[in-house]
Curated annotation (Swiss-Prot):
Residues 1-10 form the signal peptide. InterPro entries: Frog_antimicrobial_propeptide. This is Temporin-SHf. Keywords: Amidation, Amphibian defense peptide, Antibiotic, Antimicrobial, Cleavage on pair of basic residues, Cytolysis, Hemolysis, Immunity, Innate immunity, Membrane, Pharmaceutical, Secreted, Signal, Target cell membrane, Target membrane. Has potential application in preventing biofilm formation on medical devices, since it has the ability to prevent methicillin-resistant S.aureus biofilm formation on the polyethylene terephthalate (PET) surface, which is widely used in making prosthetic heart valves cuffs and other bio devices. Non-amphipathic alpha-helical antimicrobial peptide with potent activity against some Gram-positive bacteria (including methicillin-resistant Staphylococcus aureus (MRSA)), weak activity against Gram-negative bacteria and no activity against fungi. Permeabilizates membranes through a detergent-like effect probably via the carpet mechanism. More precisely, it strongly and selectively perturbs anionic bilayers membranes by interacting with the polar headgroups and the glycerol backbone region of the phospholipids, hence disrupting the acyl chain packing of the bilayer. One of its GO terms (biological process) is killing of cells of another organism. The modification Phenylalanine amide is found at residue 43.
Amino acid sequence: FLGTINLSLCEEERDADEEERRDEPDESNVEVKKRFFFLSRIFGK
């Protein structure tokens, strides 16, 4: 169950990243990495 939520969240982050990347690639990439790291820490336990 948690794995499914984690996958769906990652897909949403990826979609958002692709949209933001057109504007400012460096900043959006760092933001997504931070969010992914935070989510992986939450769901990794």
